């Protein structure tokens, strides 16, 4: 199985939002409900059922070679967020309708014609990516441009990115490229750059790798994303063990009682 992936490098992002526009245009996604919230200069604010690529503006990244809390040293951290297409996908495991499937590119695809709008995938996503449309009622998320990949084309967002902040390719190749990029950044004096690739977590890695500066959680990248069904499996295992022990205990007590004369 071919494993496609994104590498999104925040140090190259200029905040142009061309990826957002290309995603909406190619996938014919309706306009989102934009509003000024006072939290950022970004009016789309977050990923949603109608925003599958979202360029976030994170305030407070120090300039290269400077530090401290001086406002003159502050700058914007820009990152194009997207569905992570987790190796162990909580949304896929929680869906009772079979609307979410694993494709031949190892991405997670949500079939809108199968979705029943139950919302289990929404609460099962550790990244808050999957969302229900307020008008339609069904869930939607990034498709990884499945139709374009089948035609051997690059996903729309990566195709239009003018700075190569969004790169598309084989997962392992992009992992190597990310580590090479970190080495280059540190050679240039950018010591706070890091790779977000949560391999040793319950999602077992993602097919969207990120390079960010500063705290990763500031970019909606949790340090330990958890798949809810992982805990559910553990609970069922514990319950089965307890039930088995109870059954054995009951059987022993019954046989013991049967051997005594009344």
Question: Model regions: which residues?
Answer:
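Non-ligating segments of multi-cofactor redox enzymes
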Residues: 1-262
């Amino acid at each position: 199985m071919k494993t496609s992936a994104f590498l999104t490098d925040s140090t190259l992002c200029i905040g142009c939002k061309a990826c957002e526009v290309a995603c909406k245009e190619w996938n014919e996604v309706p306009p989102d409900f934009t509003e000024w919230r006072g939290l950022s200069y970004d009016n789309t604010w977050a990923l949603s059922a109608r925003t599958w690529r979202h360029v976030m503006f994170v305030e407070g990244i120090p300039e290269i070679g400077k530090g401290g809390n001086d406002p003159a040293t502050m700058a914007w951290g820009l990152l194009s967020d997207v569905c992570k297409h987790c190796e162990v996908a909580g949304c896929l495991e929680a869906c009772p309708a079979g609307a979410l499937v694993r494709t031949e590119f190892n991405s997670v695809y949500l079939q809108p014609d199968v979705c029943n709008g139950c919302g289990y995938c929404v609460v099962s996503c550790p990244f808050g990516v999957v969302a229900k449309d307020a008008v339609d009622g069904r869930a939607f998320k990034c498709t990884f441009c499945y139709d374009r990949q089948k035609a051997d084309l690059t996903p729309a967002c990566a195709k239009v990115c003018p700075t190569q902040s969004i790169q598309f390719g084989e997962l392992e190749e992009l992992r190597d490229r990310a580590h090479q990029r970190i080495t280059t950044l540190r050679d240039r004096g950018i010591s706070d750059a890091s790779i977000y690739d949560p391999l040793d977590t319950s999602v077992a890695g993602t097919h969207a790798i990120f390079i960010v500066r500063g705290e990763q959680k500031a970019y909606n990248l949790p340090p330990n994303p958890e798949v809810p069904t992982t805990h559910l499996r553990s609970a069922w295992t514990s319950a089965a063990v307890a039930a088995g022990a109870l059954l054995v205990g009951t059987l022993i007590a019954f046989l013991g009682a049967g051997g005594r004369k009344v």
